[in-house]
Amino acid sequence: MAIWQGSSLRKPSGARSRRNKNKRNAEFGRNPAETRIGDEVKKEIVARGNCTKTRATVAKRINVIDPKDNSSKNVEMLTVLENGANSHFVRRNIITKGAIVETEIGKAKITSRPGQKGIVNGVLIE
């Protein structure tokens, strides 16, 4: 079944509201990417306006910036430690923007959106 992102068919009182237009293609959405940690898998999708998005469904490496000396390194992610988007994402190893992951060089906070851009960037935290 498709994901419809239009307005509700019910009023705040619970009564059914009468629609003055049909469902449009522009109101349909997609399932979330839910990027996991593992061997790299990327998928290209066509978005609105014939724009393309690269979805990382599985990612293994992260570009980490060290704020002390402003250097960047491409390192491997080990596991998800914390995710503010959903507490169940931690045990499923799903990464989103703002998640804290364990890397080879320490903890890093994800600053990019892997489900939208297909790349994982982060900042090293203490």
From Swiss-Prot:
UniProt GO cellular component terms: ribonucleoprotein complex; ribosome
GO molecular function, a single term: structural constituent of ribosome
Polar residues bias (residue ranges): 1-10
CDD domains tied to this protein: Ribosomal_S8e (cd11382)
Gene Ontology biological process terms from the UniProt entry: translation
Pfam family, one: Ribosomal_S8e
UniProt entry keywords in alphabetical sequence: Ribonucleoprotein, Ribosomal protein
Region Disordered, residue ranges: 1-35
PANTHER family from the UniProt entry: 40S RIBOSOMAL PROTEIN S8 (PTHR10394)
Family statement: Belongs to the eukaryotic ribosomal protein eS8 family.
Oligomer and partners: Part of the 30S ribosomal subunit.
Name this polypeptide is given: Small ribosomal subunit protein eS8
Native species: Methanosphaera stadtmanae (strain ATCC 43021 / DSM 3091 / JCM 11832 / MCB-3)
Gene: rps8e
